[in-house]
């Protein structure tokens, strides 16, 4: 196996580990009262919108943990998160893209179809990803 293949496997393992961590945190929160906010919309959207794009405290907490783990392991990689956006690092060769609770509206309303998603993009091309699924607790990695 080449060094590049080993590196991809390491990145895939990390994506799987973090997706599982997100899933574990989400499961631990089930049945608890959640604080929910709604994302700010543009003026045009706001005029037409009712409550949409919820963000739970679990979304924010899980994203914070994932960001912390990624920054410890790969401090030069950029991170784009569903809740916090692009952060302080400018996009570089490697950018992690995370959605800590993909399907928050379902999650906060007790509808059990949601996921945790994490992926890595290298120079604009997706190279690694992992998705944890709420209905089966299955992890789906991809390189």
Which residues does each predicted region cover?
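DPxDG-like acidic metal-binding loop motif
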Residues: 90-143
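N-terminal subdomain of lithium-sensitive/metallo-dependent phosphomonoesterases centered on the IMPase/IPPase/PAP
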Residues: 1-101
């Amino acid at each position: 196996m080449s060094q590049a293949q080993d590196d991809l496997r390491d990145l895939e393992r990390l994506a799987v580990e973090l997706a599982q961590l997100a899933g574990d945190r989400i499961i631990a929160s089930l049945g608890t009262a959640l604080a929910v906010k709604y994302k700010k919309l543009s003026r045009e959207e706001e005029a037409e919108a009712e409550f949409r794009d919820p963000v739970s405290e679990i979304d924010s907490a899980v994203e914070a943990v994932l960001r912390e783990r990624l920054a410890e392991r790969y401090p030069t990689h950029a991170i784009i998160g569903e809740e916090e956006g692009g952060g302080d690092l400018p996009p570089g060769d490697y950018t992690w893209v995370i959605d800590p609770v993909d399907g928050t509206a379902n999650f906060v309303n007790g509808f059990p179809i949601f996921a945790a998603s994490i992926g890595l993009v290298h120079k604009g091309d997706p190279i690694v990803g992992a998705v944890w699924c709420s209905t089966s607790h299955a992890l789906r990695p991809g390189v």
